[in-house]
């Protein structure tokens, strides 16, 4: 039952439908007594009813009833930086992968690989507390702030861990993330990663909260330094070299070109965004500081920066897409989030904040959701999804401005809360009537089709009508 609820939470409706169908009424009642959310039971029976209402086309597979077994679902195998990966889902370099036991559990759970927490020869001393969250009403946090830096382990210990991981999990991709303070340190750490058996090395040019200047995002903001350090590491090792980019810049074009000209095999993007929160929970002995912001809230920013590389005519002219692969990072929580990065050209995705919230177990729904989506579309290879939406990203000047789409209200789903009315009155075009029957009505002569009402509706009662020419 818990697995069914989790599948629904992470938008894997195929698995949720299958598992809820297997539950008896007695099991549902027992589950509702046992499952408590804050101070009240989870309404599992109601959740099950809603899930089973979902209408979907039969999955393309060999079964007569249209239902795929795990073995019949499409493979998620994909080539990334000349590494064959069993799926595109990797752990991002962070607190979720700081020792052997953690990474081993993740790999056994189904993750295809890991970008291990950044290794350095420097003395790392972390602060306490070092995490904070941005919340929205009753939701889990949508934004996450952290003040962590790099691995606190002795660097020799970390490379021993990576060696053990590769020995014990030879089919998984083990990637060392490193940060040096000098040219010599960058080269030494990269060589140690190669000697440990790592499949690739990531260069951390992007940590936004380093105690010392001239490290992390200070490098990532300077294309000359990116070119300098990447070139030296590229010449020192034979394994793929993957610089990790900072979002704390105006454009990704120059940093990406620097990586390309230095001979990088790929790029990881993005790291966290510089931020400040003012809550008491973020204080360290009464003081606050600038640090990294991540989570669901940063996904649109991450996607924009991915597009600045994969959809950039300057980079295309240089031939960058033929020589460098992109690993997408930033706000990935469900398989749909991952799909968006893949459709913009990523061949690999990394997850951190969602794992910190929900655990390594989310990999089940990341993989199953993406596989079922591919099966429904009849897609047999993940690489066919890579970059397929790039053609639909255009300049603002190229958008259709002569037609509009009215919102469409389903009164059977409307609960009469008035949220749409308030938002339209105070933030829109006063195009909704809200009478004594507490049922909203669209005023066509005033509506401009902005769809603010649809976005604030708590029940999904407002949909989309057909696109029509704008009224004159």
What is each stretch, according to the model?
Residues 14-37, 397-416, 430-449, 462-472:
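Ferredoxin-like iron-sulfur electron-transfer modules
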Residues 87-93, 114-117, 174-178, 201-203, ...:
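Hydrophobic faces of well-ordered beta-strands that scaffold small-molecule active sites
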Residues 126-140, 278-291, 343, 354-379:
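C-terminal helical cap(s) of enzyme catalytic domains, especially alpha/beta-barrels
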Residues 104-109, 181-327, 335-340, 344-348, ...:
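Alpha/beta enzyme core
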């Amino acid at each position: 039952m818990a697995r069914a609820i989790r599948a629904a939470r992470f938008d894997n409706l195929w698995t949720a439908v299958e598992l809820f169908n297997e539950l008896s009424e007695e099991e549902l009642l027992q589950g509702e007594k046992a499952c408590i959310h804050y101070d009240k039971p989870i309404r599992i029976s109601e959740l099950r009813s809603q899930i089973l209402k979902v209408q979907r086309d039969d999955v393309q597979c060999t079964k007569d009833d249209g239902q795929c077994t795990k073995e019949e679902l499409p493979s998620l195998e994909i080539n990334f930086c000349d590494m064959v990966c069993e799926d595109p889902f990797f752990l991002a370099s962070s607190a979720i992968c700081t020792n052997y036991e953690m990474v081993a559990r993740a790999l056994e759970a189904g993750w295809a690989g890991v970008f291990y927490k950044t290794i350095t020869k420097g003395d790392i001393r972390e602060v306490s507390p070092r995490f904070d969250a941005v919340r929205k009403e009753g939701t889990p946090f949508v934004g996450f702030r952290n003040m962590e830096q790099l691995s606190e382990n002795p660097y020799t210990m970390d490379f021993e861990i990576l060696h053990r991981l590769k020995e014990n999990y030879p089919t998984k991709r083990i990637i060392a993330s490193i940060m040096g303070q000098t040219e010599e340190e960058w080269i030494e750490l990269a060589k140690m990663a190669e000697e440990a058996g790592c499949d690739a090395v990531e260069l951390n040019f992007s940590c936004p909260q380093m105690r010392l200047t001239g490290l992390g995002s200070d490098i990532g903001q300077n294309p000359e330094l990116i070119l300098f350090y990447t070139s030296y590491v590229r010449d020192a090792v034979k394994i793929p070299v993957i610089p990790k980019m900072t979002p704390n810049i105006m454009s990704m074009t120059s940093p990406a070109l620097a990586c390309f000209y230095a001979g990088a095999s790929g790029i990881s993007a993005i790291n966290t965004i510089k931020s400040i929160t003012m809550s008491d929970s973020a204080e360290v002995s009464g003081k606050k500081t600038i640090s990294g912001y991540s989570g669901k809230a940063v996904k649109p920013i991450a996607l924009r920066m991915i597009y600045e590389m994969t959809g950039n005519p300057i980079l295309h002219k240089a031939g960058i897409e033929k020589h460098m692969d992109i690993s997408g990072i930033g706000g990935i929580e469900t398989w749909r989030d991952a799909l968006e990065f893949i459709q913009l050209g990523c061949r690999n995705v990394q997850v951190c904040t969602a794992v910190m919230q929900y655990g390594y177990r989310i990999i089940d729904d990341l993989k199953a959701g993406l596989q079922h989506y591919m099966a429904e579309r009849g897609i047999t290879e993940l690489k066919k999804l890579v970059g397929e939406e790039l053609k639909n990203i255009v300049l603002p000047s190229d958008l259709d401005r002569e037609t509009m789409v009215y919102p469409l209200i389903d009164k059977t789903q409307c609960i009469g809360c008035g949220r749409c009315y308030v938002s339209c009155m105070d933030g829109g075009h006063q195009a909704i009537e809200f009478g004594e029957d507490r049922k909203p009505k669209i005023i066509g002569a005033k509506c401009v089709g902005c769809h603010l009402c649809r976005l604030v509706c708590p029940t999904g009662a407002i949909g989309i009508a057909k696109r029509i020419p704008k009224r004159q």
